[in-house]
Amino acid sequence: MDPGTTGIVGGVSEAKPATPEIQEVADKVKRQLEEKTNEKYEKFKVVEYKSQVVAGQILFMKVDVGNGRFLHMKVLRGLSGDDDLKLLDYQTNKTKNDELTDF
C-alpha cells in the first residue's frame, strides 16, 4: 500500500500528486481501459489520485490522455498487490479542472 494512504478503512483520501508507483499501476490497467473505450492512448499520464482502503485499495486516478483530454479511472488493487489490479470503472470527457470524486 502506498505511504500516502490515510489508513482509515472506507475513507477516501485527499487528492495527491501522482507518484511513479501510481503511474505504474495506471500503466498496468491501460490495456483494460483501451479495450473498454475502443481507443488507444498515446499519452497516458496520471496527474493526481485519491485512495480508499477496502479489502485491498481503491485508487481513483485523473489521467491526461493528450490534446486537453482527461479521464478518471477507478482501480482496485487487491490484497496481493500490483499484480492483482482490476479496472472497476472509468469516466471520459473530463477536463484538467474536474474534481476527482468517488464514482
Swiss-Prot record:
Single GO term (MF): cysteine-type endopeptidase inhibitor activity
GO cellular component annotations of the record: cornified envelope; cytoplasm; cytosol; extracellular space; peptidase inhibitor complex
Motif interval(s): Secondary area of contact: 52-56
Chief place where the protein resides: cytoplasm
Sites marked Reactive site: G10
InterPro entries: Cystatin_dom, Cystatin_sf, Prot_inh_cystat_CS, Prot_inh_stefin
Subcellular location: Cytoplasm
Described purpose of this protein according to its UniProt entry: This is an intracellular thiol proteinase inhibitor.
UniProt similarity note: Belongs to the cystatin family.
Protein name, as recorded: Cystatin-A
Biological source species: Rattus norvegicus (Rat)
